[in-house]
Amino acid sequence: MYKRQIYTASTVVGVVGVGAAAWPLIDQMNPDASVKALATTEVDVSLVKPGQSITVLWRGKPVFIKRRTENEITEAKAVSLTELKHPEKDEDRASNPEWLVMLGVCTHLGCVPLADKGDYNGWFCPCHGSHYDTSGRIRKGPAPTNLEIPKYEFVNSNTIKIG
């Protein structure tokens, strides 16, 4: 019986020792505070007027925040899905029709598109000629997909939390 107790105690001490030695190695793989701070960002949009857009950085990438006019919203909703290279309804891209939030990175080769340009009054990528509409959907050019919509939410009527 005495040998069994020594064996059990030795096993417990060994497991605890391995766990104590492994914990710092495993813990170093967690993101540090600076990375966690970049996970979300809050943007005050109270000064953005209809028809205007702003660009903010999130995780090192530009994010376009556009306050669309009634005309832009109507134009985006009127587009038939059969006309789109990457079909997506405007309602699925903008939780609040007045506000469009999307990554400002062309889905072709990662250039930054220009706002209020191109054949569809949305965005135009000067690198290779992709044209996006007022909902950020690819309409013409080499880009394979629409401009990406990040996870976001309205904290209140004047603040958008991205991430």
Tell me the role of every PLM-derived stretch.
Residues 74-163:
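Rieske [2Fe-2S] iron-sulfur-binding domain
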